[in-house]
């Protein structure tokens, strides 16, 4: 029995790269399975929209989402736990990195991302909805510790573009289903 393969490449709406999928079965309407690294394949729960590759701006012309280190007029409430300096744990319980900073949405007055410093020196953004902040660390169910290196990084250390936000959030979304092989199976 020959598996019919479908690769989606170089769509005019995806100027910046390929994304791949193939049918899981040989019949029409079969669910698609990602090819390659499922966290970066751009399909299923890891799909992302081709948004503008520029930062979202405030009505004053400043980058809307920035780290606290460049937004001195924002901070963590004294009544809340400040996670900066705490370890970040992946779904496997291993340390993925350490909280380096928090990224604030200046227009909505809320934190959008946790900046994670990885052991190799890289930095990745962790969307707040994927994080469970506790007194002794930050837990992330979506990814294993080693998979944080697969999260797309930002070009600038002080702002994030709308396209980068899409790809970052898509990576964590993909992790919900593809981080481990057993997550793809039905839950009974």
What are these regions (language model features)?
Residues 1-5, 9-188:
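Peripheral interaction segments used for macromolecular assembly
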